[in-house]
Amino acid sequence: MMRIGHGYDVHQLVAERKLILGGVDIPHTLGLLGHSDADVLLHAICDAILGALGEGDIGKHFPDTDPAYKGISSIKLLHEVMRLAETKGYRLGNLDATIIAQRPKLAPFIGNMRENIAEACGTDVSRINVKATTTEQLGFEGRGEGISSHAVVLLNKAAHSEER
């Protein structure tokens, strides 16, 4: 059995915060505001996986009202989400994600993002695709006010597991 999930996240860009995308610290004058490290890419991926599992969203599993998640690395959250998928008998088939940001240019960091995501998901990097685009200066991303991300995942039921 295969299951598909879609995730979306957005965070505001602010001064005095690190810009972390796909678990990579990106040099930039602004960073993303959030309770955790505010990694919009990994948050969208977590939501996509949770959606495919029918398990709600990242806010349900890691609420921003819980001090345990204050400043937490989103790589840790992705590990936890994948652990849940595995307990339900699912493995990642493939993942396709898009980061929407006017700046900074993200192409030099995509390879490291893919490697981080593959490691967190326990899969080969060939199953992970990450791309970045701009909005041609339109909307909040185009004005440099924030960054958003979309992710789509395909989960495959492991051959030896039963539907739970």
Curated annotation (Swiss-Prot):
Its cofactor is a divalent metal cation. PROSITE patterns: ISPF. It catalyses: 4-CDP-2-C-methyl-D-erythritol 2-phosphate = 2-C-methyl-D-erythritol 2,4-cyclic diphosphate + CMP. Its EC number is 4.6.1.12. It is an enzyme of class 4 (lyase). Involved in the biosynthesis of isopentenyl diphosphate (IPP) and dimethylallyl diphosphate (DMAPP), two major building blocks of isoprenoid compounds. Catalyzes the conversion of 4-diphosphocytidyl-2-C-methyl-D-erythritol 2-phosphate (CDP-ME2P) to 2-C-methyl-D-erythritol 2,4-cyclodiphosphate (ME-CPP) with a corresponding release of cytidine 5-monophosphate (CMP). This is 2-C-methyl-D-erythritol 2,4-cyclodiphosphate synthase. It comes from Syntrophotalea carbinolica (strain DSM 2380 / NBRC 103641 / GraBd1).
